[in-house]
Amino acid sequence: KTKEELFFDNTKLIPDWGNYEPERLKVFLGESSREDVAAGAQKRLEEVLSELVANAVEKTGLKKVVLSGGVFANVLLNQKIKQLPKVEDLYVFPAMSDGGLALGSALYFLSKLKIKEGVKLLPKSFGMVYFGPSYSDKEIETDLVRNKMVYKKITEPAKEIAKLIYDNKIVAFYTGRMEYGPRALGNRSIIYAPIDPTANDWLNKKLNRSEFMPFAPVTTIEQIKENYIGITDDPLVAKYMTVTYNCTEKMKKEAPACVHLDGTARPQVIKREDNPYYYDIINEYYKLSGIPTLINTSFNMHEEPIVASPEDAIRAFLDSGIDYLVMDDFLCGIDDNKHLVK
């Protein structure tokens, strides 16, 4: 419950604190906890941005809204905007923060070139944002050998990985091109069964992350309406983990590790055409468990970037003590590589 003094003056975008020196803030906030401060700030953010978007929709008559900028990494804010009565559809650029300027600048330059040619570029959606570096099997195996890793090649990777997850093993999954933007979307991910409500505590500790950092689910598109309230048949905004949805009772019961305290979750909705390998793992797990969802969290240690190279993946795997590392079709178990753990 937020403290009353944190409901800011609605005539101002920010509270009138005079300045932001820590000692003055402490006096202003009094005995308010960090959680109360965060809740108050979140509420005010939602109020201000919702008013701005509603005003823009009213003035322009345009009901399909595109959001970009670092503030829209706030997925609960995005849900509030999506639920505005006059917003027909919502899209959040996957690399919504400053990193998105690279693609935005390139598209802007391209549009200028095309205008000179008499061609107008029209908006269109793109597929998955696997725009980063990739490494061949030969490069991966070279790094495994150089690091003296014990490994094997698996012949039916989706089935074998799904079985490991079904047996409550944590899998660090590395394949193909790295994701563009802040979200791990299956090519640099740690995946795990969503059934343990305490996973948020112990898995975050294993990764040296803050205990309040929640995990997100990845769900196959065929089953999304059973799990998320108000979701459409093909939600582009949910492809990149950029918005929360209220969860059904079924989702809360079957995948409690992915559901926030307020009953929402930040899903990645996956089609097979988007990432066949990743989709097949989730689908094979669904066949074993009856649950079409896995935990998907970024493959990195706390305050480190998502792993990019095979060398990064090997180091993070050994540092974390995660049960298994899969790189393309190569499988490494932590028990087989304890001689390398520092």
Where are these regions (language model features)?
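Phosphate/ATP-binding catalytic cores across multiple sugar-kinase/actin-like superfamilies
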Residues: 40-65
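Active-site glycine-centered loops adjacent to acidic/histidine catalytic or metal-binding residues
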Residues: 70
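Helix-hairpin-helix/helix-loop-helix acidic hairpins
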Residues: 26-38, 42-47
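Flexible beta->alpha loop and helix N-cap segments adjacent to enzyme active/binding sites
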Residues: 1-32, 54, 62-64, 73, ...
